[in-house]
């Protein structure tokens, strides 16, 4: 993820200017539904009526699209896992590489050690108990906060900033704000194609419109 380099260079520049503490917006997307995959999840209902086999065929065809073309890359990513349903489909939004590709990177010893284990198993085990009591978006946000935010975003942000001697603080992860965001209905987090709607509305009188 090239975002780690962004954090490093921003922190490095701040340090050169004598700034030792920065504020990060990490958590905003994870709490208030701001990622593209949240919008993709919303659009999913419009083609879930298709038979699974047809969706799988569309997935195979879109995998042939050029990754160098931004639109084709997004289209391919959107339909990645189209042949899946339920938890498997939800967890697939967080996949960065297909199992077939990963197998080419692993040694035979490591593959034997893995056995029947899969990288997504912890996510599946985490989300299974709450499937019946939470909406798909709520399930996805739970995965964001438990895995993507904690294991990825906060991880590289801390390592890259501290490598330059700068501390990064995350006001969005104030425990009271996190708990409050969990009580906000989905309709205020997503409105049409607009993510983080309630957050943007709350701040529109304090920030320039282009921000």
What are these regions (language model features)?
Residues 174:
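Short, conserved phosphate/pyrophosphate- and ester-handling motifs at nucleotide-, phospho-/glycolipid
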Residues 1-165:
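Glycine-rich active-site loop/lid subdomains used to bind and stabilize high-energy intermediates
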Residues 10, 177, 198-199:
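Generic structural signal for hydrophobic residues
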Residues 191-197:
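Short, charged, surface-exposed loops that flank catalytic or proteolytic processing sites
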Residues 178-182:
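Short, solvent-exposed hinge/capping segments at secondary-structure junctions
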